[in-house]
From Swiss-Prot:
It is a peripheral membrane protein. The lineage of its organism: Bacteria, Pseudomonadati, Pseudomonadota, Alphaproteobacteria, Rhodobacterales. One of its GO terms (cellular component) is plasma membrane. The keyword Cell membrane applies. This is Elongation factor 4. PANTHER family: TRANSLATION FACTOR GUF1 HOMOLOG, CHLOROPLASTIC (PTHR43512:SF4), TRANSLATION FACTOR GUF1-RELATED (PTHR43512). Residues 8-190 form the tr-type G domain. The keyword Glycoprotein does not apply. It comes from Cereibacter sphaeroides (strain KD131 / KCTC 12085) (Rhodobacter sphaeroides). Belongs to the TRAFAC class translation factor GTPase superfamily. Classic translation factor GTPase family. LepA subfamily. Its main location: membrane.
Length: 602
C-alpha cells in the first residue's frame, strides 16, 4: 500500500486547452510513457469515462490520475494530473479543480493558435496563482506555425512563450520534455502535516457499489482510513471507509498528507450531500475556517423535458433521479403542459450542459424526449416591492402588478478570423449586444460584447458557427442582471394558448419573432376539416396571425344541373357543420411541429 509522499516530490497540475487542441491526448501520452496504465488497458481519452465525453471529444467531469515519474535527477516524483472540463458551462468545476493544483500546462494547437476558451481558462489559472508552462501541440502538422503561435501567446495572454515545449501528443514527440518541465518548472505544494485537517472537495461522483466517491486535495493535516470527518458547508459527519489514489483505477492507501490528491468513500448516499468546493475537516479538533471561494452551483438555463410517449414518464423520472445522483448542478421539478402532457422543468448550467444531459437521457436510458425552448431566469420586481424569479414563461404574473423585469447579461469573448468580423459584429448587434472591446492578435480579432443571455441560449452558437464557417470560438461569463423591456409572447392555435411555445422576448423584437413563429407553424401543422387561426399575442393584443385553410369536400358533386338552391342548401349545411366542428374540434399539433418550431432561426 503506497505511503504518504514528502512535499517536495509532489507536483499537482492541470491541463488547460481549447476543445480539440489535444488535452486528453496529451494526458493519455503522459500516462502511457510513465507506465501508469498497462499497454493492454490503454485506450484513447482514458480519463474521459462517459461515452458521451469520448464521442463529443469533450471532458465534462474533472478526472484525476496519479503518475509516478522517475526523473532524470534520479528522484521519483508523484505527479497528480487533474483533467478539467474546458467548456464554459462547467466553469465552476474548473475553478475548483484549479484551486486544487499549483500549476498548469497550457496546451495550444500550433496550427490554430489561441482560442476564446483557452483565454477564459488561462485567466482562471492565473486567478488561482498558477505557474503556467506553455506547450505547443501538433507541431508535426504541415500547417503548424510554432513561432507565430508563440508570439500570439505573448501578445494575447502576456505569458513568456520563449521556452514553450514543442510536442506532438499523437505521435509522442516531446512528451519526455513535458514531464521534465512539470518537475522543474512547476512549484511543489505547500502544507503543514501537524495542522488540523483541511481538505478541499474537488469533485464527486456516484458509483453503484461504493456509493458516492469524493475526490479531495489535502491542504493541511493528514487524513486516514477510519477517521470521522465533517463537511463544513453541510455540517454532515461521515466515517471514512476507504482511502485511495487513482491510477486511474483505485489503489488503496492508508493515509493522505498535505499536497496529495486522492479519493475517499464514506457511505454517502447522494452526490447532493457533497458540494464541490466544500472543505472537509476532522469532526473533533477540526480547522477553524473553511477554504474561501465556495459557492453552490446555480442553474442558469431552464427548459421543459417531456417524453414523446406519455407511458415513458415513470422511466424518465427514474432516469432523472439517477442522473441527479451524479450531477449536483442539475435540478428538476415536475410540470404539466396541456400540449405535451407530464414532464419536468429542468435547470442547467448552460446550453452544453443541457445538450449533454438530454443526450445522456436519450442514450443511456433509451428515452425519446421533446425539449421546449430554453429560457433563462428573469427577476420580476412587483409593484408591492417583492421580487419573484421566473423560470418558466407560462408562470409570468399579470403585467398590471409588475414594476419592471430584469434579465441576466453576459460578457462574451469571441475570437474570429479578420474576414468574418463584420458578420460577427452584425450578429451581436442583432442580438441586442453592446460592444465593449475589439483588439487584434495577428490575423484574428478578439471581440468582447455585453449580451443578454436570453439571446444566446436559443441558437446563437449555431449562428456564430455558420456565419464564420466554424472558425469562431466563443466563451462567456455571467455578469449580472439589468432591466429591459421584456414581454411574454403567447402562441394561440385555434384560440387555445399553447403553453409549450410561449416565450419571453424583447418588445422591439416581438413582432418579428411572432411573425416568424406563426409562419413556421402554418407550414408544420397539418390541415384539418375546419380552418385554424394561429396567432402570436402579447397580453390581449394579437401581433401576428396566419390561418390554415380547411380541407374541402365537394358536397355538390352529386347535383346534376337543376335548381341552384339545392346546391346552396348543401353548402350552407357544410358551413354550419364546419362552424360547429371549429367550436368543438381539437387541433392535433404533431410532435415534430413542436421540435421544428422551437428550432427556428430568429
Amino acid at each position: 500500500m503506497p505511503r504518504m509522499t514528502q512535499l517536495d516530490l509532489i507536483r499537482n497540475f492541470s491541463i488547460v486547452a481549447h476543445i480539440d487542441h489535444g488535452k486528453s491526448t496529451l494526458a493519455d501520452r503522459l500516462i502511457q510513457l510513465t507506465g501508469t496504465v498497462a499497454e493492454r488497458d490503454m485506450k484513447a481519452q482514458i480519463l474521459d469515462s462517459m461515452e458521451i465525453e469520448r464521442e463529443r471529444g469533450i471532458t465534462i467531469k474533472a478526472n484525476t490520475v496519479r503518475i509516478d515519474y522517475p526523473a532524470k535527477d534520479g528522484r521519483t516524483y508523484v505527479l497528480n494530473l487533474i483533467d478539467t472540463p474546458g467548456h464554459v458551462d462547467f466553469a465552476y468545476e474548473v475553478s475548483r479543480s484549479m484551486r486544487a493544483v499549483e500549476g498548469s500546462l497550457l496546451v495550444v494547437d500550433a496550427s490554430q493558435g489561441v482560442e476564446a476558451q483557452t483565454l477564459a481558462n488561462v485567466y482562471q489559472a492565473l486567478d488561482a496563482g498558477h505557474e503556467i508552462v506553455p506547450v505547443l501541440n501538433k507541431i508535426d502538422l504541415p500547417a503548424a506555425e510554432p513561432e507565430r503561435v508563440k508570439s500570439q501567446i505573448e501578445d494575447v495572454i502576456g505569458l513568456d512563450a520563449s521556452d514553450a515545449v514543442l510536442i506532438s501528443a499523437k505521435s509522442g514527440l516531446g512528451i519526455p520534455d513535458v514531464l521534465e518541465a512539470i518537475v522543474h518548472r512547476l512549484p511543489p505544494p505547500k502544507g503543514d502535516r501537524e495542522a488540523p485537517l483541511k481538505a478541499m472537495l474537488v469533485d464527486s461522483w456516484y458509483d453503484a457499489y461504493l456509493g458516492v466517491v469524493v475526490m479531495i486535495r489535502v491542504m493541511d493535516g493528514v487524513i486516514r482510513k477510519g477517521d470521522r470527518v465533517k463537511m463544513m458547508q453541510t455540517g454532515a459527519v461521515y466515517g471514512i471507509d476507504r482511502l485511495a489514489v487513482l491510477k486511474p483505477q483505485m489503489v488503496d492507501i492508508a493515509e493522505l498528507g498535505p499536497g496529495e490528491i486522492g479519493v475517499l468513500t464514506a457511505s454517502i448516499k447522494q452526490v447532493r450531500d457533497t458540494r464541490v468546493g466544500d472543505t472537509i475537516t476532522h469532526e473533533k479538533k477540526g480547522c477553524a475556517a473553511p477554504l474561501p471561494g465556495f459557492k453552490p452551483a446555480q442553474p442558469v438555463v431552464f427548459c421543459g423535458l417531456f417524453p414523446v410517449d406519455a407511458n415513458d414518464f415513470e422511466a424518465l423520472r427514474e432516469a432523472m433521479e439517477k442522473l441527479a445522483l451524479n450531477d449536483a448542478s442539475f435540478t428538476y421539478e415536475m410540470e404539466t403542459s396541456a400540449a405535451l402532457g407530464f414532464g419536468f422543468r429542468c435547470g442547467f448550467l448552460g446550453l452544453l450542459h443541457l445538450e449533454v444531459v438530454r443526450d445522456r437521457l436519450e442514450r443511456e436510458y433509451d428515452l425519446d424526449l421533446i425539449t421546449t425552448a430554453p429560457s433563462v431566469v428573469y427577476q420580476i420586481y412587483m409593484k408591492d416591492g417583492t421580487l419573484q424569479e421566473l423560470h418558466n414563461p407560462t408562470d409570468m404574473p399579470d403585467l398590471t402588478y409588475v414594476d419592471h423585469i430584469e434579465e441576466p447579461r453576459i460578457r462574451a469573448t469571441i475570437m474570429v478570423p479578420d474576414e468574418y468580423l463584420g458578420d460577427v459584429l452584425k450578429l451581436c448587434q442583432d442580438r441586442r449586444g453592446i460592444q465593449l472591446d475589439l483588439s487584434y492578435a495577428g490575423a484574428r480579432a478578439m471581440v468582447v460584447y455585453d449580451l443578454p443571455l436570453n439571446e444566446v441560449v436559443f441558437d446563437f452558437y449555431d449562428r456564430l458557427k455558420s456565419v464564420t464557417k466554424g472558425y469562431a470560438s466563443f466563451d462567456y461569463q455571467i455578469t449580472g442582471y439589468r432591466e429591459d423591456f421584456l414581454v411574454k409572447m403567447s402562441i394561440l392555435v385555434n384560440d387555445e394558448p399553447v403553453d409549450a411555445l410561449s416565450m419571453m422576448v424583447h418588445r422591439d423584437r416581438a413582432d418579428m419573432r411572432g411573425r416568424a413563429m406563426v409562419e413556421k407553424l402554418k407550414e408544420l401543422i397539418p390541415r384539418h376539416m375546419f380552418k385554424i387561426p394561429i396567432q402570436a399575442a402579447i397580453g390581449g393584443r394579437v401581433i401576428a396571425r396566419e390561418t390554415i385553410s380547411a380541407m374541402r369536400k365537394d358536397v355538390t358533386a352529386k347535383c346534376y344541373g337543376g335548381d341552384a338552391t339545392r346546391k346552396r342548401k348543401l353548402l350552407d349545411k357544410q358551413k354550419a357543420g364546419k362552424k360547429k366542428m371549429r367550436q368543438f374540434g381539437k387541433v392535433e399539433i404533431p410532435q415534430q411541429a413542436f421540435i421544428n418550431a422551437l428550432k427556428m432561426d430568429s
